[in-house]
Amino acid sequence: MSGENRNTTQRIQKILNSEMLKLNILASVTGLFVAILTWIFLELIDLIINVLYLGGDYLDNDLGYWAILIPGIGGLIAGIIIKYGSKGARGHGVPVVMEAVAINQSKLGTRLALTKIVAAATSIGSGFSLGRVGPVVLMAATFGSDLGQRAKLSVEETRILIGAGTAAAITTAFNAPLGGVIFAMELILSEMRTRSFIPLVVSTVMATAVARSMAGDLAAFSDLPAYTIVSSFEYPLYLILGLVIGLAAVGFIKLLYAIDKISENG
């Protein structure tokens, strides 16, 4: 009996000393703090909207035609923040993270992330047509990278923490846990392995619990009307619609990069 107890104790010690357990604990910590930071970012956007539009929003405010000037003011402030913060914040957040994971040993700059977050919140709050994905992903990935380096993790393990942070950020920003995991695995880690999948799920579960405790279980798109298929003839039309939208998306992306390139050269 004592031999069995000794074997059980050894197994427990082996589990407690395992790198996988350590990684999952750090992934849980990442999910906790990233959820809080992402919620603060979203609240900051709402605060800026409230201040700039005098208690209203983009469309419903008392500024009249003066509201047209608000995005310009916000853009000017964001430009100043980027100039004196980090000029790298001009770019897109997700590609910066992908580059760090692929060729920069999973290292990201804290100053860049802070500048990106503040500038993005100012831009979005003033009315710019910008998304939340890039800023929150960069912020979350930077947190994961910094935590991994402080915990003396390997480059590979730090890379997984970056993915865990990314998954937690998407989960919190859009209330989409599954979407967060898939986004991180496909775009950031570019792999489907158990070693990376489990920490991502752990981080996402923690982020979901924290986010819903603060903001409630609200769907990103909660007011969509119910829709039912009336005829089987609709299916070919959906295929055509998908093709058209896909081509339009490719064209939009190419146009976006072309304008970005012209802006940099100018």
Where are the regions that the model predicts?
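Alpha-helical transmembrane segments and immediately membrane-proximal extracytoplasmic
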Residues: 1-266
